[in-house]
C-alpha cells in the first residue's frame, strides 16, 4: 500500500498536468473557461478524480463536460508521460460543487444581513423594560447619613 503523502503529491501533479494540457494542447471549441480546482487519487494510485468548474451557463457546462470526456485519452497519456508512475491512473472528470455551495452560502449571508438590518431598524426607538437603573441600592446608606449622630448619642445618654 502507498502512503497518503505519495497519493497527495501525485494528485497535485495530476492537477497541474491536466490544467497545462488543457491550456496548451487541447483545441476543442466546445471547451469553455474550464478551471481545474482539485484532483484526488485512490490509495492504490489506479484512479484519479479531477474536479473542474466551468464559467458559463448549463449549456456551456454540458459542452465542456463532453469535450473533457473526448480528450480523456490524450490527458491520461500526458499524465502518464509526465508523472512517470508504473500504472497511469484512469481519469474521471467531475464538476465541482464548490461554486454552487459558495453561492448558497452567500445567499444565506445576504438574508441574515437583511434580517439584522430589519431588527436594527425596529429597535432604534425601543427602550429597555424596567427602570433606567435596575440595580437596588442598599437602604442602610440613607439611614446612616441621616441619623448617624442620633445613634451615637442615644446609647450614651441612657
Curated annotation (Swiss-Prot):
Signal peptide: none
Pfam families: RBFA
Cellular location(s): Cytoplasm
GO biological process, one term: maturation of SSU-rRNA
Region of interest called Disordered, as start-end residue ranges on this chain: 114-158
Keyword entries, A-Z: Cytoplasm, Ribosome biogenesis
Key word NADP present: no
Major localization class: cytoplasm
Keyword Cytoplasm: yes
Source domain of life: Bacteria
Segments of skewed composition (Basic and acidic residues): 148-158
Cellular component GO terms, alphabetical: cytosol
Single Gene Ontology MF annotation: ribosomal small subunit binding
Subunit annotation: Monomer. Binds 30S ribosomal subunits, but not 50S ribosomal subunits or 70S ribosomes.
PANTHER family per UniProt: RIBOSOME-BINDING FACTOR A, CHLOROPLASTIC-RELATED
Cited function: One of several proteins that assist in the late maturation steps of the functional core of the 30S ribosomal subunit. Associates with free 30S ribosomal subunits (but not with 30S subunits that are part of 70S ribosomes or polysomes). Required for efficient processing of 16S rRNA. May interact with the 5'-terminal helix region of 16S rRNA.
Similarity comment: family membership: Belongs to the RbfA family.
Protein name in the entry: Ribosome-binding factor A
Organism: Streptomyces griseus subsp. griseus (strain JCM 4626 / CBS 651.72 / NBRC 13350 / KCC S-0626 / ISP 5235)
Species lineage: Bacteria, Bacillati, Actinomycetota, Actinomycetes, Kitasatosporales
Amino acid at each position: 500500500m502507498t502512503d497518503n503523502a505519495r497519493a497527495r503529491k501525485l494528485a497535485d501533479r495530476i492537477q497541474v498536468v491536466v490544467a497545462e494540457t488543457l491550456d496548451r494542447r487541447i483545441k476543442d471549441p466546445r471547451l469553455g473557461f474550464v478551471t481545474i480546482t482539485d484532483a484526488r487519487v485512490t490509495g492504490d494510485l489506479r484512479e484519479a478524480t479531477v474536479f473542474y468548474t466551468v464559467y458559463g451557463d448549463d449549456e456551456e457546462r454540458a459542452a465542456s463536460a463532453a469535450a473533457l470526456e473526448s480528450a480523456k485519452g490524450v490527458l491520461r497519456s500526458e499524465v502518464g508521460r509526465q508523472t512517470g508512475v508504473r500504472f497511469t491512473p484512469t481519469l474521471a472528470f467531475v464538476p465541482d460543487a464548490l461554486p454552487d455551495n459558495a453561492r448558497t452560502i452567500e445567499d444565506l449571508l445576504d438574508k441574515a444581513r437583511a434580517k439584522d438590518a430589519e431588527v436594527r431598524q425596529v429597535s432604534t426607538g425601543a427602550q429597555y423594560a424596567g427602570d433606567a437603573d435596575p440595580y437596588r441600592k442598599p437602604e442602610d446608606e440613607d439611614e446612616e447619613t441621616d441619623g448617624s449622630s442620633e445613634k451615637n448619642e442615644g446609647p450614651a445618654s441612657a
